[in-house]
Regions:
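N-terminal hydrophobic targeting/anchoring segments and the immediately downstream early-domain regions
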Residues: 1-156
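Histidine/acidic residue-rich metal-binding segments in metalloenzymes
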Residues: 117-127, 131, 149-199
């Protein structure tokens, strides 16, 4: 079986793409239809049915505003398209995308900085379509300690009390928890208490 045949017979999901970070930067420069012009051909060539787009915010921004603007940019990109891709919130959306040759775009926190320490804001982001939650992007934040690359002996603190509360709410909302970038203690805290699969 060659790669093309394998791809054509498989459900292909890209579980991490910094899509909206890039899209928003390009839209700020005046570009439109960024996804169609810069990504669509590659998605089709790879037979991708679902993209999990991270909501990533760098240190130099207003985290809450930046995450909301990234979601708004996706909404604008969907409106500018002719239905090739759409915001997805459940497995049925992914199956629909696969059956119709479209791409389901799902949203994920890559660090919970946009919640600005307010656990209750997770409910609002869930209503906006966010279904995956990664507690940190390597750097530490109010919810969890990130992984460290320069200090192999660093142990850190895992999840904070706020992080534990956030994890409980994420599970209540049936969000998928992504353990990428979190430190070892946080990884094991999440895994040892897991009641459903994690990424």
């Amino acid at each position: 079986m060659n790669a093309h045949t394998l791809l054509s017979q498989s459900l292909v999901i890209d579980c991490h793409l910094d899509l909206l970070y890039d899209v928003l930067q390009k839209r700020r420069q005046g570009r439109r239809q960024v996804i169609l012009n810069d990504y669509w051909a590659d998605w089709r060539a790879g037979n991708i049915s679902c993209i999990v787009s991270s909501l990533y915010c760098d240190d130099s921004c207003d985290y809450l505003s930046e995450a909301l603007q990234q979601i708004a940019a996706l909404e604008e990109e969907v409106a500018e398209s002719t239905g090739e891709f759409f915001l997805a919130t459940c497995a049925a959306d992914i199956r629909h995308a696969q059956a119709t040759g479209k791409v389901a775009v799902m949203l994920s926190f890559e660090g919970v900085e946009p919640l600005v320490g307010e656990v209750s804001l997770l409910r609002l982001f869930h209503k906006l379509g966010v279904r995956f939650i990664g507690f940190c992007w390597s750097r530490s934040n109010w919810a969890a300690d990130g992984s460290r690359f320069k200090d192999a002996l660093y142990i850190g603190y895992g999840l904070t009390e706020g992080g534990k509360e956030l994890l409980a709410l994420a599970r209540k909302l049936h969000m998928l928890v992504d353990v990428s970038h979190i430190n070892d203690l946080g990884f094991w805290e999440i895994l040892n208490s897991a009641q459903q699969p994690v990424l």
